[in-house]
């Protein structure tokens, strides 16, 4: 069928037929994949021991990172000092402020989204 020779009514009928076929194929695909898309489950509330474990894990991340930053600052402050008295004098009067964020490479959600983007990019090519 050449679309140039069809009337508007015939084109509308053809469009309707194709849309119905498309929706039928979508339903068929959904059934073969396991039904309509489901909402992700809501996160459940943590019990107190589970909450403490999650907080302890974050505390370990922060404390290891902060101790590394503190060691670097101490090395900078005491790089030129050679006697124990000089080091004690400088560190006694020092004011430390450590600013940092958790390492984004440790965030599994971001890793997952990057992997999804890579696979999507691979499928497009």
UniProtKB/Swiss-Prot annotation:
Q: Which cysteines are joined by disulfide bonds?
A: none
Leader peptide range in chain numbering: none
Homology family: Belongs to the herpesviridae BLRF2 family.
Q: Where is the composition biased (Basic residues)?
A: 113-125
Protein name (record): Uncharacterized gene 52 protein
Q: Where is this region: Disordered?
A: 22-50, 96-125
Q: Which residues form a coiled coil?
A: 5-33
One Pfam family linked to the record: Herpes_BLRF2
InterPro entries xrefs: Herpes_BLRF2
| Domain of life of the native organism | Viruses
Is Flavoprotein set as a keyword in this record? no
**Per UniProt, which keywords does this protein have?**
Coiled coil
Q: Does the keyword Hydrolase apply?
A: no
Give residue spans, biased composition: Basic and acidic residues.
Answer: 39-50, 96-112
